[in-house]
């Protein structure tokens, strides 16, 4: 039983999320965006 709504929907695959920041991280999976870099090894992360 769901107790919350899922107002944030991915325009690419239709998956729904309860929070905008969860949707933002999910969209990065589709786009391949990796905005965070390690200061030690320069590896990029989503």
UniProtKB/Swiss-Prot annotation:
Record's subcellular location: Nucleus
Start and end residues, zinc fingers (C2H2-type): 1-4, 8-30, 36-46
InterPro entries assigned to the protein according to its UniProt record, in alphabetical order: Snail/Krueppel_Znf, Znf_C2H2_sf, Znf_C2H2_type
Alphabetical UniProt keywords: DNA-binding, Metal-binding, Nucleus, Repeat, Zinc, Zinc-finger
Gene Ontology MF term list: DNA-binding transcription factor activity, RNA polymerase II-specific; RNA polymerase II cis-regulatory region sequence-specific DNA binding; zinc ion binding
Main location: nucleus
Entry keyword Metal-binding: yes
Gene Ontology CC terms, in alphabetical order: nucleus
Family of this protein: Belongs to the snail C2H2-type zinc-finger protein family.
The protein's name in its UniProt record: Escargot/snail protein homolog
